């Protein structure tokens, strides 16, 4: 009847609007990878499913590559997918390693399911508000971090297939990645794997739907088909991504299928400068001079004043509160100048707003005012405090 048709139209319009807001309209430009993605949903009614992909720029010119899937299809699966995608982006901004990102995401899913169980016995309607939270239990996620400075690639998986890697020499293989439990299911801690990728390698992150479509073929057959498709890929990433999807996934798939392909890039050595600094207050002046000379070589003299201020404050903090060894690094990205100070400390610095009578405590406040953004990330031998400035000078 007319009412049913109108209701169908409203639901479909709402679903399509949700889809447009959940998946990235376009993948962000950054210096770590060249990326392309394709998605083919199983739900014919709405074109929606629980699979997602993402590319997230990180500090230090790095990028996070993400593919995940929520059980089920349709608008409810898509809503839970959007919740997890937002959570992953929030955790990525903290600079956490892949295994810790998945550990926090696992806790989020488990607590959401517990909240639903607790609300189910409450007043009428209260349980319905949380009813969809349990749908995220059993979700899978693959989280990869790639560093274009040294080619290191770290990754961890929660109930999700390992990515394939197509190397520049033509070989294709699947990464030997420990498989953690699905999100919210409980189990042993997540483990990370790390490898070094040559420039021009292609990572193929995918969901289960790319490898298996009902009883059409086995998982082993699907892996073999993907390897052959990657061997036949072209040089241009976007049509290659579409070609792989078309070769492996039917027009009406049994399961949602998502594919994210990323070709690794390397920053030229001339766009990275690094200095070892002694734990000596006199090193601050030398660090400022070295940074200023490097900016001159890069044609970025207009950033010398703010960069010297950032270097002075971050190096001084490292000497005063953390100790050595201390390293200063400048990275020139296409659109950003990154200043990093590495020290052996294990505590996160906090931005404070000093009173007018205070004689100190303004360092990080100044850094936050003169830079685009700043933050801290922990590494095995200490921490890195970083700050970014937007580039205005000509590219060299």
Stretch-by-stretch model annotation:
Residues 1-2, 8-12, 16:
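Amphipathic, heptad-repeat alpha-helical coiled-coil "signal-transmission/dimerization" linkers
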Residues 307-315:
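Hydrophobic alpha-helix within the catalytic ATPase
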Residues 318-319:
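Short helix-loop "hinge" at the ATP-lid/N-box region of the Bergerat-fold HATPase_c
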Residues 338-361:
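Glycine-rich/acidic phosphate-handling loop/turn and adjacent ATP-lid/helix
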Residues 7-12, 24-28, 44-71, 75-76, ...:
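Conserved subregion of the PPM/PP2C metallophosphatase catalytic domain
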Residues 31-39:
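Long, charged, glycine-rich C-terminal linkers/tails
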């Amino acid at each position: 009847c007319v009412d049913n048709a109108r209701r169908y139209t409203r639901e479909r319009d709402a679903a399509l609007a949700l889809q447009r807001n959940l998946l990235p309209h376009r993948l962000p430009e950054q210096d770590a990878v060249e990326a392309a993605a394709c998605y083919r949903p199983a739900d014919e009614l709405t074109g929606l499913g629980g699979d997602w992909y993402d590319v997230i720029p990180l500090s230090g010119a790095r990028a996070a590559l993400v593919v995940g899937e929520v059980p089920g299809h349709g608008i409810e699966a898509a809503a839970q997918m959007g919740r997890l995608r937002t959570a992953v982006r929030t955790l990525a901004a903290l600079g956490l390693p892949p295994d810790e990102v998945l550990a926090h995401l696992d806790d989020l899913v488990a607590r959401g399911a517990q909240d639903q169980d607790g609300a189910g016995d409450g007043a009428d309607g209260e349980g319905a508000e949380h009813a969809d939270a349990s749908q995220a239990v059993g979700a899978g996620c693959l989280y990869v971090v790639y560093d274009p400075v040294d080619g290191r690639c770290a990754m961890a998986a929660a109930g999700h297939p390992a990515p394939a890697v197509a190397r520049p020499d033509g070989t294709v293989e699947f990464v030997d990645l420990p498989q953690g439990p699905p999100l919210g299911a409980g189990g042993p801690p997540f483990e990370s794997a790390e490898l070094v990728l040559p420039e021009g390698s292609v990572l193929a992150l995918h969901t289960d739907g790319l490898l298996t479509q009902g009883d059409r073929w086995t998982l082993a057959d699907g892996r073999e088909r993907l390897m052959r498709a990657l061997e036949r890929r072209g040089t241009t990433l976007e049509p290659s991504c579409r070609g792989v999807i078309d070769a492996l996934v039917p027009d009406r798939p049994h399961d949602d299928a998502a594919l994210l392909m990323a070709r690794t890039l390397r920053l030229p050595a001339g766009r990275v400068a690094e200095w070892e600094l002694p734990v000596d207050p006199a090193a601050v002046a030398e660090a400022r001079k070295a940074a200023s000379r490097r900016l001159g070589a890069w044609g970025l003299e207009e950033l010398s004043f703010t960069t010297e201020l950032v270097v002075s404050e971050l190096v001084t903090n490292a000497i005063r509160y953390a100790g050595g060894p201390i390293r200063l690094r400048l990275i020139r990205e296409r659109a950003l100048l990154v200043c990093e100070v590495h020290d052996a400390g294990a505590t996160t610095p906090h931005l404070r707003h000093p009173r007018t009578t205070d004689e100190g405590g303004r360092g990080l406040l100044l850094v936050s005012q003169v830079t685009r953004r700043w933050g801290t990330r922990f590494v095995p031998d200490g921490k890195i405090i970083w700050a970014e400035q937007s580039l205005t000078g000509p590219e060299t």
